[in-house]
Amino acid sequence: MIAPDTSVLIPALAPSYEGHERCLAALAGRSPRLISHVAFETTSVLSRMPEGLRMAPVTVREALDQDFPEAWIALDAHAQRACLDRAVDAGLRGGALYDALIAATAREHGATLLSADRRARDAYEAMGARVEYMQG
């Protein structure tokens, strides 16, 4: 099972983003699953873009519903607490804590993360996630 992180999903949904076609192609035919936190991050980013590039939250939600018909994957409360403990013990901070949540969710559900964000590597490795990094 493959699950895109925000660095793949945002360009896949937004034609104005560099890498749009590449991200769409990477997801095509793979029946990707959606991590709940990635859905929130993606909706947040795309709905606060500059005028002309911005997408309405309802438009993003509709795209997510269409592209990810299966139930989203998430951590239960106990696993979220364990994730934060592991992330803090690994020395992660700031935005890397969100990367840790995404990675832990993928690991918990047996998914491989599809990412274009090599900056998240430390967090993904600290959480023990399998990651497929996009080329380019």
Report each predicted region and the residues it spans.
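Acidic, PIN/NYN-like endoribonuclease modules and their adjacent C-terminal/linker elements
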Residues: 1, 103-136
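Aromatic- and histidine-enriched alpha-helix N-cap/loop-to-helix transition segments
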Residues: 34-40, 101
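Active-site neighborhoods of divalent-metal-dependent phosphate/nucleic-acid chemistry enzymes
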Residues: 70-118
